[in-house]
Regions:
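C-terminal non-catalytic regions of proteins with extracellular/luminal or membrane-system context
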Residues: 1-171
Length: 171
């Protein structure tokens, strides 16, 4: 199964659209969705068929859109993460031209009214979510259990010798 992000390629943004962004703060929205039995695909593609770096990374089209926003705004770019699943956004965090990143989750019909309050400065989102996301999927603690491991006491088991309690470990 292939999952695509519905971002348009940069060439579809007309001069009129780009001109309308001049002297404004650009707001870029990156979205992902998932649901039961519809998690991340291992085959993430842009609409033109280009693969993502990883299933959680930002697509090439999204990177182009962010670059256009930086080039055609007043230099202030805010990225909204409209997603209920983790995304790898370290490159956004490290980009000095990104002024703010706000995770909105999936706020439903009225939740973006609260997002508008944050963007206008009426509310300060100083709280923290209880979830912690790894900056890279391979740095997540669960990944330490993946891989091929060699056991030093494997020869005992192969020879038919009975394992001692010390060999069995405290499982």
């Amino acid at each position: 199964d292939t999952y695509t992000v519905g971002e348009a390629p940069a060439e579809l943004y007309t001069d009129d659209i780009l001109e309308s962004a001049k002297d404004t703060t650009a707001i870029v929205v990156l979205s992902r969705d998932s649901s039961e039995a519809s998690d991340y695909s291992t085959n993430m593609k842009d609409p033109n068929g280009d693969s993502f770096d990883t299933p959680m990374s930002i697509s090439a089209y999204e990177k182009e859109m962010i670059q256009l926003a930086k080039e055609n705004s007043n230099g202030k770019v805010i990225v909204l993460i409209n997603s209920d699943v983790p995304m790898e956004i370290q490159e956004l965090k490290d980009d000095p031209e990104i002024g703010a990143i706000l995770w909105t989750g999936l706020p439903g019909m009225n939740g973006f009214l609260g997002v508008c309050d944050v963007l206008s400065g009426d509310v300060n989102p100083s709280g923290h979510i209880s979830d912690t996301y790894a900056t890279s999927s391979v740095s997540a603690p669960a990944m330490t259990n993946f891989g091929l491991y060699t056991y030093t006491n494997a020869s005992n088991a192969e020879s038919g010798a009975e394992l001692t309690e010390a060999d069995k470990g405290d499982w």
